[in-house]
Structure formats: C-alpha cells, structure tokens
C-alpha cells in the first residue's frame, strides 16, 4: 500500500506547541501543546498508526498555562532517557515510560538566583550535547541549564527588553537570541562578557523568532513582529541581511531550516501558506519559493523532522498536518 503524502490529526483544542520526535525508532511521533485561555492546558504525544493511517494519542499530561514551546530531546539513537521539555512558567522535563503509554514529570527546573519566576518565552536543546538546554525569558535574561544536574550553569542579561527566542548553533559554544529590542545577538559560552549584535531592525521592531542553520552555521533566519518577510543573516557580515524572503501576504509565524540541507528553509504564515525556499542562488535575490502548500487556516507553527527529513509538520487552528515534501 502506497503511503499517503498528507496525514491530518484533529485535536480538541487549538495547537500551539509542536515538536517532531528525533528518535529513529519513533518515526511518526509528535508532541503537541494546547493554547487555551485557562490555567490548565494540555500536551499530548501522538503517534501515527501506520496500519490504520490514523494518529492516536498515546499519552499526555496537563500543563499550567499554554506551553510556549515543546521539544523532544535531540537523541536519534535512543542513547538517553526519552525526554520532552516544555516551557511556560518554568522549564519542565517529562519522561516517556518504556511502554510508550505513560509520561511523567521528571524535573521542574528553577533558578535559585531569582526570587520570582518570569515566564519563559522559548528554549533550545543543544544537539551536540543534550545535557545543555538554553531558555529565554521576558525578564531580559537567558539561562543555560545542565539538565542532568538540574542546575543553571549560567544566567545572563541578554537584551534591553524581553527575550522572545533562543537558538544554539551547531556545536556547544555559540547561541543567539532575539527580542523586543529588535536585535539579534550572538553569544559564546566560552566568553559571556561580550555579545555580538548580528542584526538590528530599523526603528527597533521586535524580532520574534530565530532559527540557526545546522548544516551551515554561518546562516540564521529571523522574523519581525507582524511582518510577512523572512530575514536571512550571515554572521560573517553583520547588520545587513544576506537575503529577504518576500512572498507571504501576512505575518510569518514560524521558520525552520531543513535538517539535512544547508540551502532549504520552510516558512509558515497567517496567509495559510507553508513555503519551502531554495537559497542556493544567494547572494542573488530569491524571488519565489520552491514549493507552496495551502492550509485551511492561519498556520501557527511548524516542525521539520530530523529523523525523516522528507516530512514537515504544521499546525493550524486545532489541526496538525504532516506533509511529505
């Protein structure tokens, strides 16, 4: 039987958090997080049943406030515990049971340095050393955690205003963050006294998201608040975009570089479109996307599978779709 190219899962709630498991032995497993205006929210782990062609909820848990991000541990070969991280009021780590049918809270990480807890806006898990995880907060700080000890390795004031997103480069030393002050800043864990401003938006429009190209770590992508364009940056040439991707008709909500290719990136937007771009002709202007997919509603989120790079997941309203590209 030939596999379908699109599978859909309908959730009982609006989906915001979305992450594709990196484990090779769990190829069609994802985590989805709710966006409800109540205190009690939810995260479900869903798995495609390849016999019935349907997604099934295999386990899940209640979560205080909507999770700002969900992410599986980058562990393709199952060498580590089967962990899922979420952020919201705190950073939490959840462990899936060996039967795959249960998931429990493993640890709640709090920084003893701070007296109160400011909401965490995002985080990233280091692929080279999965004991490292970095969180960003609306209190202007970023924190690097050692998840094995449960301790903060370092906390730094990263921006002048709220920090909205954080991402590691390939390797264990470099990370970058974006925030409400309109800057993208790069840090080196070996020398946190200094940061490099890679880009600042004209008139300091907030930058909401960033994504680091793992195949060619010279390149980053970022998006501005309420903007239909995607900014591609080259860290060797700060302050001037290497390219601008202008095709979406409404605000871009998510960006993801291809896990297996240095020159492909996917972008999703309120215009209901998911676009894949080929950037191999840079520095020539990139006029049009390579592939276009039209969803039924504004696309809030995407996740590109690292274990099967020909699959991308998107979330719109209460629907999750996985698309073969």
From Swiss-Prot:
InterPro entries: DCAF7-like, WD40/YVTN_repeat-like_dom_sf, WD40_repeat_CS, WD40_repeat_dom_sf, WD40_rpt
Keywords from the named record: Repeat, WD repeat
Domain of life: Eukaryota
WD repeats: 62-104, 115-155, 158-197, 247-287
SUPFAM superfamilies noted in UniProt: WD40 repeat-like (SSF50978)
Family: Belongs to the WD repeat DCAF7 family.
The protein's name in its UniProt record: DDB1- and CUL4-associated factor 7 homolog
Species name: Dictyostelium discoideum (Social amoeba)
Upper taxonomic lineage: Eukaryota, Amoebozoa, Evosea, Eumycetozoa, Dictyostelia
């Amino acid at each position: 039987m030939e596999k379908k190219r699109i599978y859909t899962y309908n959730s009982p709630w609006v989906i915001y958090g979305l992450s594709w498991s990196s484990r090779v032995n769990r190829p069609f497993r994802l985590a989805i997080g709710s966006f409800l205006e109540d205190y009690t929210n939810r995260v479900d782990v869903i798995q495609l049943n390849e016999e019935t062609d349907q997604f099934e909820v295999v386990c899940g848990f209640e979560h205080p406030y909507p999770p700002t991000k969900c992410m599986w541990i980058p562990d393709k070969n199952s060498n580590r515990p089967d962990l899922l991280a979420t952020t919201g009021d705190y950073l939490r780590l959840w462990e899936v049971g060996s039967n795959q049918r249960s998931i429990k809270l493993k640890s709640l990480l709090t920084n003893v340095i701070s007296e109160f807890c400011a909401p965490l806006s995002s985080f990233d898990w280091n692929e080279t050393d999965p004991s490292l995880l970095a969180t960003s907060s609306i209190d202007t700080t970023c924190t690097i955690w050692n998840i094995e000890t449960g301790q903060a390795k370092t906390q730094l004031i990263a921006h002048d205003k709220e920090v909205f997103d954080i991402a590691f480069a390939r390797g264990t030393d470099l990370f970058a963050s974006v925030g409400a002050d309109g800057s993208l800043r790069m840090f080196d864990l070996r020398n946190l006294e200094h940061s490099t401003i890679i880009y600042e938006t004209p008139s300091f429009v907030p930058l909401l998201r960033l994504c680091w190209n793992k195949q060619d770590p010279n390149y980053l992508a970022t998006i501005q608040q309420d903007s239909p364009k995607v900014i591609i940056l080259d860290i060797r040439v700060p302050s001037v975009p290497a390219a601008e991707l202008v095709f979406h008709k409404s605000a871009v909500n998510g960006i993801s570089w291809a896990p297996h290719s240095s020159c492909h990136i996917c972008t999703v937007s309120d215009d209901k479109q998911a676009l894949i771009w080929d950037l191999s002709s840079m520095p020539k202007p990139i006029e049009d996307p390579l592939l276009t997919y039209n969803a039924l509603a504004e696309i809030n989120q995407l996740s590109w599978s690292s274990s099967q790079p020909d699959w991308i997941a998107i979330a719109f309203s209460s629907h999750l779709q996985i698309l073969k590209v």
